[in-house]
């Protein structure tokens, strides 16, 4: 007898950007995926396309490693993701914190291996951050200070430092 293989479904189409309040405010690229974040209706959610595509957000059941990824940053405060910046990890900056989006292991990000960890609780302003070498320069959300976010191997993560030591900008 020949039986149907129902262990994997065909790709299921998904479009989270269809209507008022659903358009992303931050877009970037990371590990061959286009990343969207910061909608009005889902301010702490991120969507990553299928590997190697610009807008394909389809997924299968059970999930495959190249499927689209959708998740929400669970934080103590609800803040819209303002900026996405690709470094060694994907950095998501909100008005109250800086988040590191990475894999739970050292492999690529997949639907089953995505992890989000806070790096600091300073927050970024509306001005577009600048990547210089392997650091991010950004305006703080409060106080008018310019800050640097860079990896520190002793801390095992990204730390932020104030570059406006003498006067705010």
Q: How should these model regions be labeled?
A:
Residues 25-27, 33, 41, 72-169:
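Beta-sheet-dominated scaffold domains
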Residues 2-9, 60-70:
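Acidic/polar, low-complexity linker and loop regions
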Residues 1-23:
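Small/polar beta-strand repeat architecture
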Residues 12-13, 68-71, 115:
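Short, flexible loop segments at the rims of nucleotide/cofactor-binding pockets, characterized by
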Residues 2-5, 32, 39:
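Generic structural motif
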Residues 37-67, 101-111, 115-117:
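Beta-propeller domains
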């Amino acid at each position: 007898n020949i039986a149907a293989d129902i262990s994997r479904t065909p790709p299921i189409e998904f479009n989270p950007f269809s209507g008022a309040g659903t358009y992303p405010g931050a877009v970037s690229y990371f590990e061959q995926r286009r990343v969207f974040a910061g909608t009005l209706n889902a301010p702490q959610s991120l969507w990553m396309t299928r590997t190697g595509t610009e807008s394909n957000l389809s997924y299968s059941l059970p999930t495959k490693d190249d499927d689209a990824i959708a998740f929400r940053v669970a934080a103590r405060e609800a803040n819209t993701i303002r900026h996405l910046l690709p470094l060694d990890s994907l950095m998501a900056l909100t008005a109250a914190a800086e988040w590191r989006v990475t894999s739970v292991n050292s492999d690529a990000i997949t639907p089953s291996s995505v992890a989000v960890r806070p790096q600091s609780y300073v927050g970024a302003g509306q001005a577009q951050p600048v990547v210089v070498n392997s650091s991010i320069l950004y305006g703080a959300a409060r106080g008018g200070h310019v800050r640097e976010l860079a990896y520190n191997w002793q801390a095992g993560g990204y730390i932020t430092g104030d570059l406006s030591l003498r006067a705010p900008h």
